[in-house]
Amino acid sequence: MDSEAFQSARDFLDMNFQSLAMKHMDLKQMELDTAAAKVDELTKQLESLWSDSPAPPGPQAGPPSRPPRYSSSSIPEPFGSRGSPRKAATDGADTPFGRSESAPTLHPYSPLSPKGRPSSPRTPLYLQPDAYGSLDRATSPRPRAFDGAGSSLGRAPSPRPGPGPLRQQGPPTPFDFLGRAGSPRGSPLAEGPQAFFPERGPSPRPPATAYDAPASAFGSSLLGSGGSAFAPPLRAQDDLTLRRRPPKAWNESDLDVAYEKKPSQTASYERLDVFARPASPSLQLLPWRESSLDGLGGTGKDNLTSATLPRNYKVSPLASDRRSDAGSYRRSLGSAGPSGTLPRSWQPVSRIPMPPSSPQPRGAPRQRPIPLSMIFKLQNAFWEHGASRAMLPGSPLFTRAPPPKLQPQPQPQPQPQSQPQPQLPPQPQTQPQTPTPAPQHPQQTWPPVNEGPPKPPTELEPEPEIEGLLTPVLEAGDVDEGPVARPLSPTRLQPALPPEAQSVPELEEVARVLAEIPRPLKRRGSMEQAPAVALPPTHKKQYQQIISRLFHRHGGPGPGGPEPELSPITEGSEARAGPPAPAPPAPIPPPAPSQSSPPEQPQSMEMRSVLRKAGSPRKARRARLNPLVLLLDAALTGELEVVQQAVKEMNDPSQPNEEGITALHNAICGANYSIVDFLITAGANVNSPDSHGWTPLHCAASCNDTVICMALVQHGAAIFATTLSDGATAFEKCDPYREGYADCATYLADVEQSMGLMNSGAVYALWDYSAEFGDELSFREGESVTVLRRDGPEETDWWWAALHGQEGYVPRNYFGLFPRVKPQRSKV
């Protein structure tokens, strides 16, 4: 058992070691691929600089196997006459690059780089003179301005391998990742130059005419025909680069390459990671990649070990198919746009991140009713009847404004608003036609909802008077045709009813009547749409008549039936509200003898209220507010004139309310100094506590108002008065978080320390006190007591004092530095 456990532990350690080794190799491979990407970026910059040359570079010939270092290769005549640096190096011509060719120029590529760093494991690929054309030129890392087309990849020696056809010749080294499923670089022997770098494939855009010959040559080298003449992929790659990029387009491509390097830190690059190794770092270092849309469509077309597709596979067909797809813009924006896989100069048209113009106007109106309906449903229980602009006739929110639009369809109703609701029963015939007047709005949901509202019109038949009284309001509503109806009350939203309450006709009727009540008289309660509010029609008519008479609308001949029954109440209200009507002369001499009243009894029954007897005298009464209420409110708001008038009507300016708050408390909290001074001078009690024991000095201290504290102390405020809740003095109530705390706290602390020391220790009694023990002194309000000893070791709240030749203990919270001010006016 121990051996098995040891063996399992050893296997586990071996697995951990292998996993760590693999992670280390992956990190090294990531660094290697990053260096390769940097070299490729420099290569593309050099290619873009040389793309302005008058002639394309000619591909040199050479077998795939490693040839002698300076062996001449068979070059076709069209390319051999262009004076490529390789031919100049072979023939010893006088070209500027040909004189620098010697064997020592290849030494920097052998084990150490010019910077002293060891070269990568793929160094043998750099030793191929046919795969790297710049070995024959000078060691200057910067290309010459002339003869740019001669050597397209001439560059300074680099210790790190660059992507491209540099690895395409020679046998694979032991470090080639032939078995890595996620590596974008496949086997150099199993695949042609296209398998190594799918981004080097032909562009979906048509090539320029100047490069037709190199394109055909490159195509023949890909297909395997003419491999001896065009086997070196370097020239074919240069031709393809010149075909792919227009002149001076290297800035945008460099930006895209730089942007491609950033996502290399994330594990999932695109959707193609499903088919590749998840954590392969080389997946994310390709300078150009097809987007996820193209990758998913054609991954199985090639039997490549690379996770990306060649650029010449399915690019144009997918782009053409994608143009017809309306949703491709969003997908291309979501995948190809942010990753920047294609240079903007040769992007397909379908990848341009431009939103389509046709789906936009169709989608916007389709989404508008959704938020509006939800808002109406949350705010109003009857949103279904009034959410549309057509304003269906059964809506209780619109105060009879919609009928003029829908009533002209039936011919027997030429005037729908003059005598409004006797004509409402024919509305069910017009209900099926309600969707047709408003076809411009999506009203597909309203016809089934409108099957419920035809019930309320049957309830409205016996009450034409209500609509007669509201005719001017309705006509004014017809002029103002707002798209959305607002609740009549500006102070609240109408309460939302439960779904089952909308089908009850009584509740809909109550909601309609309440919506028609004038705004100043509308109730603010939350239960006004409850079933208990549904009163008989007579009461509602009576209420409407009362309102019309109160607003002096006497031209109400419309109400016909029950008017004699309701007129006594309305006339009594009118007599109290304003001047009497010209018709009734009888109520003017009320003090007349009783024998004159019987002949006028019939008229007085119509003129006088039923709540008052016929012979009762009328007195002119006016409302009189409580002076205490006026005093408290005016002291808080700072109205000195009102305070003075209220004090004249009161016997005690310190009269408190039910909470013990006096006008002096409110004036101090409102920082009204003039009112504070007036109340103190008028004899207000500066020590009047409220229900919590707060005196005016506590209020002033809590506001950090030193000026008011000084005024209160000088007029006999109790310095050591304590609150009932926490027993705190005024000094302890100073607010340290408000302005003026330091001054107020310092002043109150000095006053406390001065009590019994200033004025030869004289303090003044503010209340009467009767001694309970033999060692205590009794005193009355206003008497001066001399403090002999304070802060004794045994008593802290009691001082040893002398009064009238007697000594004893006195409570310190009964005294102040100054005597209390007496009232200076006679009581009313």
From Swiss-Prot:
**Record GO terms (molecular function):** cadherin binding; identical protein binding; transcription corepressor activity
Q: Name the keywords, alphabetized.
A: Acetylation, ANK repeat, Apoptosis, Cardiomyopathy, Cytoplasm, Disease variant, Ectodermal dysplasia, Methylation, Nucleus, Phosphoprotein, Repeat, Repressor, SH3 domain, Transcription, Transcription regulation
One GO biological process this protein is involved in is: multicellular organism growth
Q: Where is the protein situated, by its record's location annotation?
A: Cytoplasm; Nucleus
Looking at the record, which segments are called Disordered?
A: 45-267, 286-371, 393-506, 520-619
Give every SH3 domain span.
Answer: 758-820
- Omega-N-methylarginine modification, residue list: R137, R142, R144, R160, R167, R180, R205
In terms of CDD domains, this protein maps to: SH3_iASPP
The ANK repeats extend over 659-691, 692-724
Q: Tell me which Pfam families the record gives.
A: Ank_2 (PF12796), SH3_9 (PF14604)
Q: What domain of life does the native source organism fall in? A: Eukaryota
- Tissue and organ expression note: Highly expressed in heart, placenta and prostate. Weakly expressed in brain, liver, skeletal muscle, testis and peripheral blood leukocyte.
Composition bias type Low complexity, residue spans = 213-232, 594-604
Which GO cellular component terms are attached? cell junction; cytosol; intercellular bridge; nucleoplasm; nucleus
List residues modified as N-acetylmethionine: M1
Entry annotated with the keyword Ubl conjugation: no
**What function does the entry list?**
Regulator that plays a central role in regulation of apoptosis and transcription via its interaction with NF-kappa-B and p53/TP53 proteins. Blocks transcription of HIV-1 virus by inhibiting the action of both NF-kappa-B and SP1. Also inhibits p53/TP53 function, possibly by preventing the association between p53/TP53 and ASPP1 or ASPP2, and therefore suppressing the subsequent activation of apoptosis. Is involved in NF-kappa-B dependent negative regulation of inflammatory response.
What domain notes does the record hold?
A: The N-terminal region is required for cytoplasmic localization.
Name it.
RelA-associated inhibitor
Give the organism the record lists: Homo sapiens
